[in-house]
A protein has these predicted regions:
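Extracytoplasmic small-molecule ligand-binding "clamshell" domains
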Residues: 10-98
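Extended ligand-binding regions for polar small-molecule ligands
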Residues: 2-4, 59-68, 147, 212-254
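Ligand-binding clefts/hinges and TM-proximal coupling segments of bilobed small-molecule sensing domains
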Residues: 15, 19, 151-165, 202-204, ...
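Periplasmic-binding protein-like
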Residues: 116-124, 191-232, 252-270
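Short helix-initiation/N-cap motifs at beta->coil->alpha
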Residues: 21, 74-85, 128, 145-148, ...
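Short loop->beta-strand "edge-of-pocket" segments that line small-molecule binding or catalytic clefts
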Residues: 32-38, 133-147
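A ligand-binding cleft/hinge motif common to bilobed small-molecule-binding domains
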Residues: 85, 99-107, 154, 176-177, ...
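Flexible hinge/capping segments at coil-to-helix
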Residues: 27, 124-141
């Protein structure tokens, strides 16, 4: 049987060997397990709780994918910079790690239909709040390697000094330790973090374009991609991602965000 809720025990998958050919849908079904790459340290989207179980918005979705495929799910922890490589090396079948769709990434992987909307945000200590990008002049901004925040600031604000980390947990610890003046990543994530860390505030709540978050598969894995798209459309009929939000995000955000500003149903962005 497969897990039907967000309480999936943390585990790691082994690489499928030296071949770079992605597993087909039939091969995944026959194996009885789908390998899904998720974050282990990006609460409330993908994280490991104190019982060693994977939790979060992406994980709730991943559990449903496995259930509807009729397989178990094997979670593989990824960091932002490793997401593409884990697909191309077949360490995972699908990435569900808060993966923002960009033109550059779409050259390397195939994105399915989106299930979430997002922009960038900037969090900083309340006593030295960064509320405008101009406030970052002469300051150090913490970002994750391989993230849209890194790309955005390098392209649009090259004079801003960036301090980069592989892991989100490292990045936030750097902010707590005062190694940087602010941190930028998805606004959905910094809003959640600031609510749980007294003395910090999101001074810039929406920066850059409104982007979408989507599952990704290895380039050319059309069969799995088509199945994912059909699944996302089908889930839209039951308002699945509204339920996902209410289960995993609403307990964190409360009334500070509007559900429909974040959630995408049936792959259709409104």
């Amino acid at each position: 049987c497969s897990n039907s809720d967000a309480d999936s025990t943390a585990s790691s998958a082994s690489s499928s060997g030296n071949t770079a050919k992605a597993r087909t849908l039939d091969e995944i079904k026959k194996s009885g397990t789908i390998r899904i790459g998720v974050f282990a340290d990006k609460k409330p989207f993908g994280y490991v709780d104190d019982k060693g179980a994977y939790q979060g918005y992406d994980v709730y979705f991943a559990n449903r994918l496995a259930k509807d495929l009729g397989v178990d799910v094997d979670y593989v922890a990824v960091d932002p910079a490793s997401r593409v490589e884990y697909l191309t090396s077949t360490k995972v079948d699908v990435i569900l790690a808060n993966f923002t769709v960009t033109d550059e990434r779409a050259k390397q992987v195939d994105f399915a239909l989106p299930y979430m909307k997002v922009a960038l945000g900037v969090v900083s200590p309340s006593q030295n709040l960064i509320s405008l990008v101009d406030d970052l002049k002469g300051k150090t901004l913490i970002v994750g390697k391989g993230t849209t925040a890194e790309t955005y600031f390098e392209e649009h604000y090259p004079d801003v000094k960036l301090l980069k980390y592989d892991q989100y947990s490292e990045a936030y610890q750097a902010l707590l330790d005062g190694r940087g003046d602010a941190l930028s990543t998805d606004n959905t994530e910094v809003l959640a973090w600031a609510l749980e860390n007294k003395g910090y505030q999101v001074g810039i709540t929406s920066l850059g374009d409104i982007d979408t978050i989507a599952p990704a598969v290895q380039k050319g894995n059309t069969e799995l991609l088509n199945w994912l798209n059909d699944e996302i459309k089908s889930l839209g009929n039951e308002q699945f991602f509204h339920k996902d939000y209410q289960k995993t995000l609403e307990p964190v955000y409360g009334q500070t965000t509007n559900l429909d500003d974040l959630v995408v149903e049936g792959g259709v962005v409104n």
